[in-house]
Amino acid sequence: MPGTPNMTYKFTNAIIRKPNKSIQNALSSQYLNPSYEKVLQIHKNYISSLEEAGLNIAILNSLEQYPDSIFVEDPAIIYKKNIIILNPCDSTRNGEAKIIKNEIGKYFEKILIVEKGTIEGGDILNINDHFIIGLSNRTDKLGAENLSNLLVSLGATVEICHTPKNILHFKSECSLIDDDLILVSNKMSKLDYLKKNYNLIELPSGEENAANCIRINNKLLI
């Protein structure tokens, strides 16, 4: 795929949000209610891991009125020096995009907005200057096409495909760990597009959650 090698996982800065107590009411495909105290500890460990990876960290205030707001990738993505404001699907997340735009938009050269359809960052896999958008219960065709047009205008290439059934987000069960190497669950390994274009590491049955990881410089966070 075209692009600057390593651009996808070479980071100097991170934007995260403080956990909110209302995360216990966050959306879940497994109908789980996470413990706020446990989330605080995991978040603390996450910050330590980011610091060990050499990142500067901007910490946004918690948003109690939005249970899922700790997941800052869903309402916005960053490409080059631009921020693209997305349109989360669920009504409980409708205000997050506007808030994050006001919080960090000033730090970017351009603010672009997906005006139509629904789309969340969890359905977008970035591989250097290429993007794979997975259609899901959270991301529809109209939202994917609108984002695609914005990305192409910035010089990117885009592929739109379907997320397998019963997977919340495209990246719930796949993650980029090198320029052409993707860690995948068994379901994701069957996608023709991924099989034809990338080297895949398939996780064993029962280890699907490990596919939801992130490569940061020389560290892999699971």
What does each of the following model-derived ranges do?
Residues 2-222:
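The feature marks the mature, well-folded catalytic cores of soluble enzymes
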